[in-house]
C-alpha cells in the first residue's frame, strides 16, 4: 500500500518521493516500547507476528543517520510478516532529535558525531536482552543496519 505521508524523516533528508510503501499490519503486532539501557529508557519500535509458536528469531534494525523514521519502522513490519521479532532502537535519543536539523552537514556535526560508539554498542546489547525477555530467541539473533547503522552492524558481528 502506498501513501503520501512523509512522516518521520528529518528535513535534511529532502527531497523525498511523493509516496512510500507501507506494509499492512493486520497479521502483526507493532508499536513503540521503551528499553532500559545504561540508566535511561531508550525508545524503540518493534514488530512481531500476531501468531507464533514459541520464541521468534530476532532482527535488530539499526537506523540510518535520519533516525527511526517510517521507512525503518516499515522494515520492522516487513520482517514481522516473515516471522521475526524486529526491533529498531532510537540510538540518538540521549543526544537529540534528527528532525531538528535542516541539512546533512549540520545533522552529522550536531548530532551523529556526538553519539559515542561505546554507547551505541552497549545500547544494542540491551536491545538483545529486551528481545530475550519479550519472546525473542537470541540464539537466532541477526542485525542489519542502514547508512550510519551499517557500521554498527559490522561492529556487532565482529564482537
For each feature predicted by the language model, list its residue ranges.
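N-terminal cap/leader regions of alpha/beta-hydrolase-fold enzymes
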Residues: 1-159
Amino acid at each position: 500500500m502506498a501513501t503520501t505521508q512523509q512522516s518521520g524523516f528529518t528535513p535534511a533528508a529532502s527531497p523525498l518521493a511523493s509516496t512510500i510503501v507501507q506494509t499492512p499490519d493486520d497479521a502483526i503486532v507493532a508499536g513503540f516500547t521503551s528499553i532500559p539501557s545504561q540508566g535511561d529508557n531508550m525508545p524503540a519500535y518493534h514488530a512481531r507476528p500476531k501468531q507464533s509458536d514459541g520464541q521468534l528469531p530476532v532482527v535488530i534494525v539499526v537506523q540510518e543517520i535520519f533516525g527511526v523514521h517510517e521507512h525503518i519502522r516499515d522494515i520492522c513490519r516487513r520482517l514481522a510478516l516473515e516471522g521475526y521479532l524486529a526491533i529498531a532502537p532510537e540510538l540518538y535519543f540521549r543526544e537529540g532529535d534528527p528532525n531538528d536539523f535542516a541539512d546533512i552537514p549540520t545533522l552529522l556535526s550536531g548530532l551523529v558525531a556526538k553519539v559515542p560508539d561505546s554507547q551505541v554498542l552497549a545500547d544494542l546489547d540491551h536491545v538483545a536482552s529486551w528481545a530475550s525477555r519479550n519472546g525473542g530467541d537470541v540464539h537466532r539473533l541477526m542485525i542489519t543496519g542502514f547508512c550510519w547503522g551499517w557500521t554498527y552492524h559490522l561492529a556487532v558481528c565482529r564482537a
